[in-house]
């Protein structure tokens, strides 16, 4: 398994429009029609979505919250998106306290670029359970450097991988133990590729961006054929 990761820091000053459809999920406490509780066949998927919500929160807040279990979720589907409203239990290792946490994780569409199949995943909310509204508007254009909104970068050539190690970093096993989010990113690639790629060797490019709105994050995952 190999992947390239691009990251962009938060950008301040983006315009915030009116809150929309996602406000409903929180106003009803995630308990409106269609509630799902474990165990279910999608348990693995929901667990990954919940962990990415926690990762986004930890990254933005500088915390180290850990996933305990997901409690319930429901789904809202549109023509170009699938939003998952997830309530989970999170733990703060510094005081061993367990508390309720909510995240909205969205499949925001996919497209083909050259030989890549790219899926756009988004975190649209991630916070300890509360009653505040959700800002669903994700601005990929005005708030971000154009370098991060254009085409996904190309996979490095064999020559570059062999002779130009300044362009990449080889992840060590110790890195995986110290940064569990790397494993979550890797699992998201496997989740995406299981229906797209049949080869046993997998390559992926991951681009993480943020639009400056608290609790927002985008992950674009390109499967390299």
Curated annotation (Swiss-Prot):
UniProt-listed InterPro entries: MS5
Similarity annotation: Belongs to the UPF0725 (EMB2204) family.
Name assigned to this protein: UPF0725 protein At5g63820
